[in-house]
Design a protein with these regions (language model features):
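Nucleotide-activated sugar donor-binding and catalytic core shared by glycosyltransferases
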Residues: 1-84, 89-207
Length: 207
């Protein structure tokens, strides 16, 4: 017997049970309507972009390209603010400080705990990331995701239109982010199911 968290790997396999995704289930407990955080308060009235970027393969020029695209967006759209909980990796911090320094509408903050970050995503207009798990969590909150990578392990999100695969080059990231900001219908998405409700989801998938 095989157990999986989503539908798409099951298409050509027998004896598979969908068990749900506990990562998504956690959102029911962490996201709160009465949550308050000073950074989220700072961003009220703006279109908030939450950023995560730390993948080792992006260190160096690829990461600088990402950050330059983000800064270009902030400089162009005066109603956009960015909150970036910076990874503890010294290389990431150095690049972030160099590329974002002096930009008042980009806040570099310390890493958040899971409750804080889930509520940051909920308060955001969109999320820009090179991370994997966020590609599942953000769509479950109804938030579009701009994936700053060339590939993704979540192709079902791309097919559903909740993930926007931009690559890691500055012009591509800038162009895709600008599209999401200037075409509001691209960000008005319904929360994706993303296989939550683990206790109630154990069912056999027919091949």
């Amino acid at each position: 017997m095989h157990q999986i968290a989503a539908q798409w790997p099951a298409k050509a396999m027998a004896q598979i049970f969908i068990t749900g995704n506990t990562e998504i289930d956690a959102l029911h407990y962490t996201v709160r309507n009465d949550f308050h955080h000073p950074e989220i308060e700072w961003a009220k009235g703006s279109r908030l972009i939450a950023v995560t970027a730390h993948k080792r393969e992006n260190l160096g020029e690829p990461m600088r390209d990402m950050f330059r695209a983000i800064r270009r967006i902030v400089e162009e759209f005066t109603d956009v603010k960015v909150i970036y909980p910076v990874h503890l990796n010294p290389q990431v911090r150095k690049i972030a400080d160099e590329e974002f320094g002096g930009c008042e509408r980009i806040h570099l903050i310390e890493p958040l705990d899971v409750v804080e970050f889930h509520n940051l995503m909920k308060a955001s207009y969109l999320i820009m990331t090179d991370s994997g798990g966020i590609q599942e969590e953000a769509p479950a909150l109804g938030k579009p995701v701009l994936v700053m990578r060339d590939t993704t392990e979540r192709p079902e999100g791309v097919e559903a239109g909740t993930l926007n695969l931009a690559g890691a080059r500055m012009e591509d990231i800038y162009r895709e982010c600008r599209r999401l900001l200037t075409e509001p219908e691209k960000t008005n998405i319904c929360p994706a199911e993303m296989a939550g409700n683990s206790p109630g989801r154990r069912k056999k998938v027919d091949s």
